[in-house]
Amino acid sequence: AKHVVTMIPGEGTGPEICEAVRMVIDASGVDIKWEYEDIGLDCLEKYGTLLPDKTIQSIAKNKVSLKGPTTTPIGTGHKSANVTLRKVFDLYANVRPVRLIPALKRPWDKLDIINFRENTEDSYAAIEHMVSDEVAQCLKVITWPGSYRIADFALKWARDNGRKKVYCVHKANIMKMTDGLFLEAFRAAAKKYPDIETGDIIVDNCSMQLVRNPGQFDCLVLPNLYGDILTDLCAGLMGGLGFAPGANVGDNCAIFEAVHGSAPKYAGMKKVNPSAVLISGVMMLRWLGEKEAADRIEKAMYQVLDEGKRVTYDVGGTAKTDEYAQAIIEKMHAGVK
């Protein structure tokens, strides 16, 4: 096979979503061999860990993975498998694009933003402690190398994908050292990309501007915490997490996955919308250089959504997960306009 991809179906509705996505990607004619591996709560019973070694080895070997949603056990002392994956492979860039999907009838004229969220530091580095019974403290750690590499990654992605504008989101007016450093590193990285328009925007103003007029933004680079919050806000602008794709990327590998959870209450019902994982799969195809197949899948998906006949319940239809996938495949075979 031309490409070998580690497929992690995940939990809850994950396996049925990933099966639908695999059908669509295979139907596009791309030569992919899928290597199936497990992750999550099922593995805890089988292997005594949420993230088995053989899954890690498969991703390390193939350097690319498509992953379904997993369930993070709350309050069990087990770290989320997602967080562990990010640490093991140093997946420092969380890439979350949002685009206007006409069928979702959102009020914006234009929405086409790629968010680049720093994935390894900031106040999410899990350095928290109780100072006394009544005082809790959290350390916000920002480093120059961590900040520079996410900025450079975003600027390079922008250049490679024909994007024009990259803005850094921060709160350096108040957090002069930490966010100040993040902004400084961004400006230093930007010097290598004179062809790209760069600037910065304060996070609270950015939130307001996103809701008022999201069409003004192109690419945003964000520290971890603001990135977590604003990427979900952007998913809302787009019409919800059912269509929000994502990728976690490092220097040696990339894991593509939806942002949404595993919705265990719907497991096995073939009810949920696989679009977020499908669009993540489309991102993966572009990453692998299979641009033509990626475009075909995307156009077919938009057409099926526009027609609104064979779509899932969350967008007003009655189609099952696999029926929606089948409709997309038929559109592709009919020759997408």
Q: What kind of region is each of these model predictions?
A:
Residues V4-G10, S65-P69, V166-A172, I279-R286:
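Short glycine-rich or small-residue beta-strand-to-loop segments that form or flank ligand, phosphate
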Residues T6-A27, S132-D204, Q216:
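Glycine-rich phosphate/diphosphate-binding loop of Rossmann-like nucleotide-binding domains
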Residues E11-G14, K63, F116, A154, ...:
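Buried hydrophobic positions in well-ordered alpha/beta secondary-structure cores of metabolic enzymes
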Residues V21, I25, F186, V277-L285, ...:
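Buried hydrophobic packing segments
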Residues D31-K54, M208-L210:
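N-terminal beta-loop-helix "entrance" segment that forms/cooperates
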Residues I32-Y36, N161-H170, Y193-I201, E290-E298, ...:
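Flexible, glycine/charged-enriched surface loops at secondary-structure junctions
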Residues L41-C43, L210-T312:
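Glycine-rich phosphate/nucleotide-binding loop
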Residues E45-K140, L225:
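N-terminal glycine-rich phosphate/adenylate-binding segment common to multiple enzyme folds
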